[in-house]
Structure formats: structure tokens, C-alpha cells
């Protein structure tokens, strides 16, 4: 099983020691402390994936292993479809650019990534430069795909995103929210179930896919209704749908893949 035990992590990063405590005979880290979470995830990325990534103090701190498993599941589907050197678009790469970096590091792909927050764009570019990888970062200016000048006339084998998924009535800014301290734009997907932004990716993305291209979205377990709506939308635009499950610790995530025939 892919992972990094706490006792091993502190051997690689001594900064973690101040966040470690014992519960029974096991070492624990208080991951509610954002600085502890940042240091641990930086260590995981370096030790397991040889990536040197900095995290923005005001941004969402992604879980590296479930992002990797998300990518792995998606690229297994691409391989089954006979796509070996895909052109990839990530929607909403965030300040870490972790999904795009993992794709570029481990797969033979041409990678484009969008982000709306200008501060996060600068941060993502620094992470990309630090790892000496070629990823094209684009300011989406609040758009999903359509209307982004840099994407005009482009086609992709994969459009991938872990989109914002909280409902329009949720309040995200300035507080701990759903286990995350992050900016509103990273969390609020809109719609009754948080499905609205995912709908945009699907409705617009279908026109930017090559034949056999895939739209791959990751979603949490609850609410089930959100997943049902996203699957229904994929089918409405003519995509064949596959759903995989991945689990890291107690977190269950669903990978919803829409395939263009």
C-alpha cells in the first residue's frame, strides 16, 4: 500500500517532530494543524514522488496519495483506449499544481493547466520551475474552458479536475471548512449539490476532446446525489461512463470518467 509512516517521515523531515505525539504505542500527527499538514505532505511528495513542492498558507492542502491514485486510475483508462502520449488539460490546478506535476513526472504527456487566482498562478509556476517540468499554466479569468484564448482550437485526450464541490449556500471563506482551510474559489462548486462547475467542465469539455478522449473528475462520497447528477450529465452529452473508487486512510473518493466514443 502506497504511503509514508510517521516514524519514517520524521527521519526525512525533522521539522515534523514538533507536531508528533503518542497515542498508545503509535505515533500521531495533529493534521488539524495546517503547518503540520503542510510539512507532512511536502515530505510525502519528496520521498514517494521526488517532487519539491511548496504550499500556500491560504490555499487548500491536497492529499498527495489520493491525487496520485486519481491520476493512476485515469491513465489506466487512457491506456486501455490506446492513448499513450496524451495531451492533457487540468482545470483548476491550484497553488500547488500537484495533479499536473504528478502527470508530467510519471506519464509521457503534454500538460496544460488552468487557474483563476493570480497569486496561486504565480505560486504554481514557481513549483513547476522548481521541479524543472514543462507545464503550460493559463489564467482562466473565471472561465471553465470556453472563452479561454490560449485553449482556442485545441483538442485534448484528457480533461482532468478535482473540481470545487460544495453547494452555492455553503460558506467557505476565512474558516475551517469541510476539513480544509482554503479560499472560496477552491471549494464552492455552485448548484444545490455543488455540481454546477462540474457541469460546465462536462458541457464545454466535450467540444475540446479528441476521439476516445476522457473527462475525469474526482468526487467525495457524499452526497451521492451529486455523483448521480454528474454521471447523468456525462451521459446526456454522449459520453460513456466508468466509475472507480479509491481509498486513502478513511477517505473514499470516486473517479467519474466520461469517455468520448
Curated annotation (Swiss-Prot):
GO terms for molecular function: 23S rRNA (adenine(1618)-N(6))-methyltransferase activity. It holds the Pfam family Methyltransf_10. It is an enzyme of class 2 (transferase). SUPFAM superfamilies: S-adenosyl-L-methionine-dependent methyltransferases. It comes from the Archaea. Its EC number is 2.1.1.-. The keyword Ribosomal protein does not apply. InterPro entries: METTL16/RlmF, SAM-dependent_MTases_sf. Keywords: Methyltransferase, Transferase. GO terms for biological process: rRNA base methylation. The keyword Nucleotide-binding does not apply. Belongs to the methyltransferase superfamily. This is Putative methyltransferase MJ0046. It comes from Methanocaldococcus jannaschii (strain ATCC 43067 / DSM 2661 / JAL-1 / JCM 10045 / NBRC 100440).
